[in-house]
Structure formats: structure tokens, C-alpha cells
């Protein structure tokens, strides 16, 4: 009928395995489905992750998780366009503004203090008020020096968030949060390594007043639910393009509200 929806998925690995299912049959399971029933389509594709057909055709679990998320987002985009109602209103219309931050201060070989300061000045000049910066690739002492520069440049009033990208073991994380408390960060994101992150996050949260965030690297809503239930984090950061789409994003939002967690 001429309606279309746009969806996307995020992947940090080779995208060829994610494209593959569309070349050997997955499209036949999608064509003809009702886009106004996004949860039904999502479940249909997601449940293929544990089936004989996916094994026989070489559809990886990651591919199906990403595809189901992208399809769900596309369905919701189509629903919004067809109804001529923006999704924020379809989802309840609780707010019409959202806070934003800029992710910056990435590591790069040869990047010196002068370049870091210039980067921050440019971001401030175009109006940014909240800054998320990267740590975890250097020693605590070296990262603390970078954070001193960053805090001095942005000032005491602007928000500073710290993203470790799962770069620390628990011992280093405990040292890091103690050292970084003086920078008054809004949160520290994914501070510990992946293999025992929920247990480590719970231990770490008892060692600091800085809110801990996580969830971005989970691959299902159930992993996020476990983080909430185990009281491992104070802020849930899930990525609808990594898994779940908007359908499961709404579920996680409700779960956070019921458990008094921020998103």
C-alpha cells in the first residue's frame, strides 16, 4: 500500500553473517507478515535462534537477534507514519524532550593534551552541556590526568560521564571509582570485564557512591532483567538496535520504573 518503515541494527562484528539469512530463505518468513503486529513478528524471528532450520541454513544467533531488532524498529516506524502520530506519543507521550550527551575524548595514537582540549572546546562552542568520555585503555593514573584536563575544560557545572567499555578487572575498578569520585561523574558505564560482570558490578556498587550503568552489551532483555534483579546497576543502558527493538525497549523501561532504576 506504499507504506514503508526504516529499521536498523548495530553490530560490532562482520556484517556478512547478518546479511546471509536474507539470501537463503529468511525473507520468505517475513514477507506477508502484518507490520502492525510488531511483537508477533519479533517473536517469530527471535525464536528461530534455537531451531533446526537456523542450524541447517547457517543463520547465526547474533544475526537473528540483530535482524529481529531491526524489523521491530521498522514496524514501529511504519506504524507511526501510517497513523501520522509520532512514536513518542504512541508510547504514551510522557515527555516531548529528552536529555542528550556527546561521547568524546576517544583514545588515538598521537593524540596529545592540546588536541584533547581543542576537541572539548569545539564541542562546548556548539552548545554541548553533557560529555561522556572514554577511559580504561590506560592506567588509572594516566586516565585520571586526562579526566583532570576534561573537567577543567568543561567546568564544574556540566555533566561528565565516564565509559570504561568493560576495560577493568574488579580490583582495578575499585581503585578507579575511588580515584575518579573527585571528578563528580554522573555515572560510570560498564566498568568491569564481561565474564563475571553482574557479580563484579554488585560488589563494586557497594564500594562507591557513583551510579554504575550497564546493559548495552547484553544480547537479550533477560540479561538486562538479571542485572536489575541482582541489583548490579543503578542505571540501565540498553540498545534497541542491538536486541529487542522498541517492543522490548518498552518492556525494559517499565521494568526499570517498577524497580526504581534510571535509564
Please identify what each model-predicted range represents.
Residues 86-90, 115-122:
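Short, charged beta->alpha transition segments
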Residues 119-134:
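Catalytic domains of carbohydrate-active enzymes, especially glycoside hydrolases
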Residues 3-82:
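Metal- or metallocofactor-binding catalytic centers and their adjacent structured scaffolds
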Residues 76, 101-103, 107, 128, ...:
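Tryptophan-centric aromatic hotspots in well-structured domains and transmembrane helices
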Residues 133, 138-263:
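Catalytic core of soluble alpha/beta enzymes
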Residues 88-108, 146, 153-157:
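N-terminal small/glycine-rich loop or linker at the start of catalytic domains
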Residues 97-115, 135-136, 164-170, 213:
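Active-site mouth loops of central-metabolism enzymes
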Residues 17, 21, 36, 40, ...:
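Conserved active-site and cofactor/substrate-binding residues in soluble primary-metabolism enzymes
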Amino acid at each position: 500500500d506504499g507504506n514503508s518503515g526504516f529499521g536498523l541494527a548495530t553490530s560490532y562484528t562482520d556484517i556478512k553473517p547478518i546479511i546471509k539469512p536474507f539470501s537463503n530463505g529468511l525473507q520468505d518468513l517475513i514477507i506477508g507478515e502484518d507490520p502492525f503486529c510488531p511483537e508477533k513478528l519479533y517473536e517469530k524471528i527471535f525464536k528461530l535462534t534455537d531451531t533446526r532450520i537456523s542450524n541447517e541454513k547457517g543463520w547465526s544467533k547474533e544475526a537473528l537477534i540483530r535482524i529481529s531488532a531491526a524489523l521491530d524498529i521498522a514496524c514501529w516506524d511504519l506504524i507511526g507514519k501510517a497513523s501520522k502520530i509520532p512514536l513518542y506519543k504512541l508510547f504514551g507521550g510522557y515527555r516531548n524532550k529528552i536529555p542528550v550527551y556527546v561521547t568524546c575524548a576517544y583514545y588515538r595514537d598521537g593524540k596529545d593534551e592540546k588536541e584533547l582540549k581543542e576537541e572539548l572546546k569545539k564541542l562546548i562552542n556548539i552548545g554541548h552541556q553533557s560529555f561522556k568520555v572514554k577511559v580504561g585503555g590506560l592506567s588509572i593514573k594516566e586516565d585520571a590526568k586526562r579526566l583532570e584536563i576534561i573537567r577543567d575544560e568543561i567546568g564544574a557545572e556540566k555533566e561528565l560521564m565516564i565509559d570504561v567499555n568493560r576495560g577493568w578487572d574488579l580490583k582495578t575498578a575499585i581503585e578507579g571509582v575511588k580515584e575518579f569520585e573527585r571528578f563528580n561523574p554522573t555515572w560510570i558505564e560498564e566498568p568491569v570485564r564481561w565474564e563475571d560482570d553482574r557479580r563484579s558490578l554488585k560488589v563494586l556498587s557497594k564500594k562507591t557512591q557513583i551510579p554504575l550503568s550497564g546493559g548495552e552489551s547484553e544480547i537479550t532483555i533477560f540479561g538486562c532483567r538479571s542485572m536489575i534483579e541482582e541489583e548490579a546497576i543503578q542505571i540501565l543502558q540498553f540498545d534497541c538496535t542491538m536486541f529487542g527493538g522498541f517492543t522490548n525497549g518498552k518492556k525494559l523501561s517499565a521494568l526499570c520504573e517498577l524497580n526504581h532504576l534510571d535509564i
